[in-house]
């Protein structure tokens, strides 16, 4: 999830950079 976006119920939440946060809940871009 590096340089990905946290997927929120309303769409896309703020950018996520931490790999421990960017996983299945992030769309990789």
From Swiss-Prot:
Domain statement: Has the structural arrangement of an alpha-helix connected to antiparallel beta-sheets by disulfide bonds (CS-alpha/beta).
Compartment(s): Secreted
Species lineage: Eukaryota, Metazoa, Ecdysozoa, Arthropoda, Chelicerata
Domain of life: Eukaryota
A single Gene Ontology CC term: extracellular region
Similarity comment text for this entry: Belongs to the long (4 C-C) scorpion toxin superfamily. Sodium channel inhibitor family. Beta subfamily.
Tissues and organs where the protein is expressed, per its UniProt entry: Expressed by the venom gland.
The keyword Flavoprotein belongs to this UniProt entry's keyword annotation: no
Official protein name in the record: Toxin Bl-4
Record key words, sorted: Disulfide bond, Ion channel impairing toxin, Neurotoxin, Secreted, Toxin, Voltage-gated sodium channel impairing toxin
Organism, as annotated: Buthacus leptochelys (Egyptian fat-tailed scorpion)
